[in-house]
Amino acid sequence: MSLLMISENVKLAREYALLGNYDSAMVYYQGVLDQMNKYLYSVKDTYLQQKWQQVWQEINVEAKHVKDIMKTLESFKLDSTPLKAAQHDLPASEGEVWSMPVPVERRPSPGPRKRQSSQYSDPKSHGNRPSTTVRVHRSSAQNVHNDRGKAVRCREKKEQNKGREEKNKSPAAVTEPETNKFDSTGYDKDLVEALERDIISQNPNVRWDDIADLVEAKKLLKEAVVLPMWMPEFFKGIRRPWKGVLMVGPPGTGKTLLAKAVATECKTTFFNVSSSTLTSKYRGESEKLVRLLFEMARFYSPATIFIDEIDSICSRRGTSEEHEASRRVKAELLVQMDGVGGTSENDDPSKMVMVLAATNFPWDIDEALRRRLEKRIYIPLPSAKGREELLRISLRELELADDVDLASIAENMEGYSGADITNVCRDASLMAMRRRIEGLTPEEIRNLSKEEMHMPTTMEDFEMALKKVSKSVSAADIERYEKWIFEFGSC
């Protein structure tokens, strides 16, 4: 706790008190007194303790003065209420109201007018004066009754609205099943809400059939996530499910797509986490986020935590460029992952939490994290058969010309990643549109019909697209990945 914060809060409290904002001043005074109490526990020197106690007493006296001012102001407000209370306490019977002339006696007319009226006015005018008092009483009584009537009407309207809301809510409460809510006691509400936003509740709608090739990777993910829920009695002891899977490979090979398929097909709670989710500018908050993430995953188990680009969160420790804050986050992540297995000999495998990670830089990952990610699989570039299958998946919504040969196109795409093949298909599908609108004005383009725009994609379009789109992964990169997976892989 900084002394600068205490001094700033004292300044703010005094400024609010001078400006007449006593409620805010009391809040700051109370906060300062609490902060000073905490600070006094940390002070070991007796002389300093005495000094701080004197300061505390002085500020406490100031706070009491502000309290007294607030009480005085409240008493002014309360002094005006008896009149209103007396008005509301008037009986409902009109005969009793007329028999109370006390308010009129408190408001006499000025002296000179009294003399004039007593000297020059006739007795009829004196006889008329009680009628004015009656009018005053009648008007005041009518106001009281009107106020009461309005209050009763407002209450009735509120009750009717509440009843309607309950009726509207009741069908939803019956139809929607009750879902367990994570108990956020002890954690910041904003942190819990931020992590709950990262839970993919809506299906990404990516099926296993939407992913071409990668048979081994799909088989491993099904074994790690799906089978333990189908056969919980089998996956116990030494057969416990894998608690960590690392997908390694060049960019654009389908690592994130596999994670989306896991979220769609495996029916587990899926946390999509990135480095921005687990980092904070406040000291110690990043570690809390990591711990909270795994506690929420255990609560919503069976769960899968997908950490994309994990090298940005848990790179190698002990380097000169490493910051203390990032080191603490890595330590907390490693501790939570080691205790996140949830599938020891006596635990239920259907309540597991699995960490699914993806990276393009496996050589930068810390050794301890590499040990915790028990299965390390290589996601390679698609084979010739995989490229042809990927072409069919990408072009299934397009109309193709009769001369299109997908097998020959796949052969010409050797070394292309899955993302590169998708880009080629997208570029080829736009070729016919480009030819059709060439030389036309914007008005003519707007007047084109849908039939004129949807023309079949030809083999020539693919050849032109292949000339424009080059592969994004070099042979040297592939060799580096294969060397790492040969040394550290666990398929």
From Swiss-Prot:
Q: How is it modified after translation?
A: Phosphorylation by DYRK2 triggers ubiquitination and subsequent degradation.
Instruction: Note down the stretches annotated as region Interaction with microtubules.
Output: 1-185
Q: Which annotated residues bind ATP?
A: 249-256
* Activity control summary: ATPase activity is stimulated by microtubules, which promote homooligomerization. ATP-dependent microtubule severing is stimulated by interaction with KATNB1.
MF annotations from Gene Ontology = ATP binding; ATP hydrolysis activity; microtubule binding; microtubule severing ATPase activity; protein heterodimerization activity
| Basic and acidic residues bias spans | 145-169
Identify the enzyme class.
Answer: isomerase
The reported result of mutating residue 309 to N is: Abolishes ATP dependent microtubule severing activity and localization to spindle poles
As stated in the Swiss-Prot or TrEMBL entry, residues carrying the post-translational modification Phosphoserine are 42, 109, 170
Q: Keywords, A to Z? A: ATP-binding, Cell cycle, Cell division, Cytoplasm, Cytoskeleton, Isomerase, Microtubule, Mitosis, Nucleotide-binding, Phosphoprotein, Ubl conjugation
Q: Which reaction does it catalyse?
A: n ATP + n H2O + a microtubule = n ADP + n phosphate + (n+1) alpha/beta tubulin heterodimers
| Pfam families for this protein | AAA, AAA_lid_3, KATNA1_MIT, Vps4_C
Q: Where is the composition biased (Polar residues)?
A: 117-144
One GO term of the cellular component aspect? katanin complex
UniProt-listed GO biological process terms: cell division; cytoplasmic microtubule organization; microtubule severing
Q: Name the InterPro entries on file.
A: AAA+_ATPase, AAA_lid_3, ATPase_AAA_core, ATPase_AAA_CS, KATNA1, KATNA1_MIT, KTNA1_AAA_dom, MT-severing_AAA_ATPase
Q: Report the family membership.
A: Belongs to the AAA ATPase family. Katanin p60 subunit A1 subfamily.
According to its UniProt entry, the function of this protein is described as: Catalytic subunit of a complex which severs microtubules in an ATP-dependent manner. Microtubule severing may promote rapid reorganization of cellular microtubule arrays and the release of microtubules from the centrosome following nucleation. Microtubule release from the mitotic spindle poles may allow depolymerization of the microtubule end proximal to the spindle pole, leading to poleward microtubule flux and poleward motion of chromosome. Microtubule release within the cell body of neurons may be required for their transport into neuronal processes by microtubule-dependent motor proteins.
Q: What is said about its interaction partners and assembly?
A: Can homooligomerize into hexameric rings, which may be promoted by interaction with microtubules. Interacts with KATNB1, which may serve as a targeting subunit. Interacts with ASPM; the katanin complex formation KATNA1:KATNB1 is required for the association of ASPM. Interacts with dynein and NDEL1. Associates with the E3 ligase complex containing DYRK2, EDD/UBR5, DDB1 and DCAF1 proteins (EDVP complex). Interacts with KLHL42 (via the kelch domains). Interacts with CUL3; the interaction is enhanced by KLHL42. Interacts with KATNB1 and KATNBL1.
User: What is the name of this protein?
Assistant: Katanin p60 ATPase-containing subunit A1
Organism per entry: Homo sapiens
Instruction: List the taxonomic lineage.
Output: Eukaryota, Metazoa, Chordata, Craniata, Vertebrata
Gene name on record? Answer: KATNA1
